[in-house]
Amino acid sequence: MLSKGLKRKREEEETMEALSVDSCWLDPSHPAVAQTPPTVASSSLFDLSVVKLHHSLRQSEPDLRHLVLVVNTLRRIQASMEPAPVLPPEPIQPPAPSVADSLLASSDAGLSASMASLLEDLNHIEDLNQAPQPQADEGPPGRSIGGISPNLGALDLLGPATGCLLDDGLEGLFEDIDTSMYDSELWLPASEGLKPGPENGPAKEEPPELDEAELDYLMDVLVGTQALERPPGPGR
């Protein structure tokens, strides 16, 4: 009886010591825990909790507090392994324009302004060139325009060259016409086949010419033969 009581008392003392040690490891304000990295402290606490759990399971009356300690240690390790919330990235400020960029922008603006002014000048010049010329004022009917008499004909308005041609006459105009295409010599090769044969060839027989007396005789003969061939009438 005494031995059993001493054994139970010893087990209770060991349990109290284990709980005190575990509470020290679970307290983050403890200097040993604060100096130890979190991963090392968590792994050491988990190992110690597992050892205590195995030791209590070997006893006749296991202590469930060691199991609760292991579960809490696992939760703490899982919470420490969760990633920290990612902060949204800070907006990147555009770089300030440099002096070279400002100079290029100013030069481009000056160049575009000069080009625009040149184009406007060109358009103005084109408009002046395309503007209609003022026409001469038409006077009243019968009045000469530009010193030209309204009674002049169309041939008179042609100028002095036409007057010279009219003075020379129409014969000079016809003499200038090229009549070479109308020459008979150009048509000789085409009309050679139409020429009569050589003189030595047989000549065509021409019908004999009859006099008027012979014609009258022939007419009388023809009339007489027709009268003979006609049958006599019933009264004859």
Swiss-Prot record:
PROSITE patterns linked: SERTA
Record keywords: Transcription, Transcription regulation, Ubl conjugation
Protein modification: Polyubiquitinated, which promotes proteasomal degradation.
InterPro entries in the record: E2F-SERTA_domain_protein (IPR052262), SERTA_dom (IPR009263)
Domain of life, per lineage: Eukaryota
Region annotation (Disordered) ranges: 190-211
SERTA domain boundaries: 38-85
UniProt cross-references to Pfam families, sorted A to Z: SERTA
GO BP field: negative regulation of cell growth; positive regulation of DNA-templated transcription; positive regulation of transcription by RNA polymerase II
Annotated GO CC locations: cytoplasm; nucleus; sarcoplasm
Tissue: Detected at in testis, lung and, at lower levels, in muscle, liver, spleen, brain and heart.
Assembly mode: Interacts with the PHD-bromodomain of TIF1, TRIM28/TIF1B and p300/CBP. Interacts with E2F1 and TFDP1; modulates transactivation activity of TFDP1/E2F complexes. Also interacts with CDK4.
Function comment: Acts at E2F-responsive promoters as coregulator to integrate signals provided by PHD- and/or bromodomain-containing transcription factors. Stimulates E2F1/TFDP1 transcriptional activity. Renders the activity of cyclin D1/CDK4 resistant to the inhibitory effects of CDKN2A/p16INK4A.
Protein name from the UniProt record: SERTA domain-containing protein 1
Organism: Mus musculus (Mouse)
